[in-house]
Amino acid sequence: EQGANTYDFSHDRIRNVAYAEISPARRRSLHRRVAQALEQVYGVDSDTTSAQIAGHFEQAGDIQQALMYYQRAAEVTLRFFAYQDAIAMLNHAVSLVRVLPAGPTATEFELELQMRLCTAWAAITSYLGSEADAAYTRALELCRQVENKPHLFTVLWGLHEVALYRVEYEESRALARQCLEIATELGDPGLLLEAHHAAWGPYYFLGDYDKAFEHMQAGLAIYDRAQHEPLSVHYGVHDAGMCALYESTLALWNMGYLDQARSRQARVIALAKELTLPANIADAYSYAGLFCHLLRDPQETQRFAEPALQISTEKGYPFTRILSAVLMGWSLAMQGQLAEGIALARLGMDAAEEANMRLHTSQLSAILAESLMTAGRHEEAIEVLDQGIRRFETYRDLLCASDLWTLKGDALLVLNAGYDAVEECYQTALTLARRLGAKVSALRAATQLVKLQISHGRADESRCELQEIYAGFSEGHDTPDLRFACKLLEQQI
């Protein structure tokens, strides 16, 4: 002992014995004094010691003060992307709320903690796991007990995203409409941006591009990168402005506006260079890679998939890790690194299946199948394509859906499956693509069908249809798919 109120222990065991000898009342008093001393020393700069202060207040029996500092400590850990640490701390804090008397104070404390749990679970599961759903559902229950419209907006937005990732589009749209109503009522431009962000997602994945573009344009009219990028932490773990740009890029490609799509891709790349948050950068590069795959450009695909995969792996973002792994695998396979590329693409697809991922599964299945076919593994490719077709029939992921049948026809042709089986695949692909308004996919299917018929002396059967589809393109004639179709048509003149 050094003085009446100070202690110095040179060994943990001595300290523990001495601590046990102090009476509970004295112990609580000392913890309170330590907490208050730390507050005085660090003041407003107590972020680095907030967890320590929280622990002392908890041991002092001052639960409300402990909760305030645990909340602050969780915010600090979230800023450093330490999501698991934040979740552990927040769950402990939620357990402390149970010590408080039931009432508005306890409800408000738990709501603040649950909001941060929502943020953490959304980040580390990409809305794919049950944990994010449970966190948002509990937060919604709490929002109904207190009047907090901004928190209600955030919770409804999160539940919309959970529904979107489960391809429950009607539920997603209904929640997005509620977000629009609240944002309009509050008059907050940032919330209005995120409300449009919620609204365009289900329309995009349903292929209702006119309505999706309407909300995208409304959102982009509001969007300012410096002001609104930080919102991504709470809304989608990706930047709203970037989302509008890359989803419209993919939509324009699907509709056959290829030059406009490439122009929009240039905006994606330009904005990606300005983004500051790792999750947003990984997201931007993953989607840039998806578009480069559609353009059949493995070098450019690798240019974007590689940094996206590195960031996603380091930070633990499952959704972009899956996308970038499959894309990176394809790019390597197309450039001759077959074994490494296929292994990486399969790793991504296995992770997608484990996470029960439902968005982009058609394109990802096509990517893996193309990689396998490049290596001459056509039987395996057909297995992947059949699984992709089954997923499409269940989840209706539209982009590249008809390409699954086109690729299956290509694989069957190599395996000498017979004219009728191959033609059926191409015809199915063409019919589906035309029904979905997927002009590039329709062109691909029609091109392969004409090639097949030429080889069997029956070219006139589908040549006119290919001519009609090709004539429907007013731009993008220098892209690989249009160049190949044009060459094929010229050979038949």
Spans of features found by a protein language model:
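Short secondary-structure boundary elements
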Residues: 1-88, 92-101, 372
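Tandem amphipathic alpha-helical repeat scaffolds
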Residues: 17, 55, 72-79, 95, ...
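Tetratricopeptide repeat
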Residues: 34, 66, 73, 86, ...
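Short coil/turn linkers that connect adjacent helices within long alpha-helical scaffolds
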Residues: 41-47, 59-60, 80-82, 100-104, ...
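Flexible inter-repeat linkers and adjacent short helices
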Residues: 63-153
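C-terminal non-catalytic interaction modules
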Residues: 131, 138-141, 383, 387, ...
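Surface-exposed acidic, glycine/proline-enriched linker/cap segments
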Residues: 216-252
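Eukaryotic tandem repeat interaction scaffolds
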Residues: 345, 351, 365-397
